[in-house]
Amino acid sequence: MGIIKEIFGKVRIYQLRSRVDSRGFMSYVFDENIYDFSIKEARIYSMPKEGTFFGIHYKEESSPMTKLVTVIKGKGMDYVIDLRKGSPTYLQWESIELSEEN
């Protein structure tokens, strides 16, 4: 498990540590010995219809929030937009396809 990509110096894409054997599939979603942040809240969402747009989440720099997003089944797009005024990457964006494979 490690960082495979960093976006805007703030957003990190991690490769989860997982294994498959005769018993099935196992993946570490969070390990405090690896990540440099803590988790205060956990949520699980289900989007049963293809093409569902879930929402836009915005946080002020003065009250940052760490989010750990993973896809258990299927795939989805996650978008990151730099809205920090004065940032050299202001208004730039990237998309990341998340899936059960990554």
Regions found by a protein language model. Give the residues of each.
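Non-catalytic, conserved peripheral segments adjacent to functional cores
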Residues: 1-101
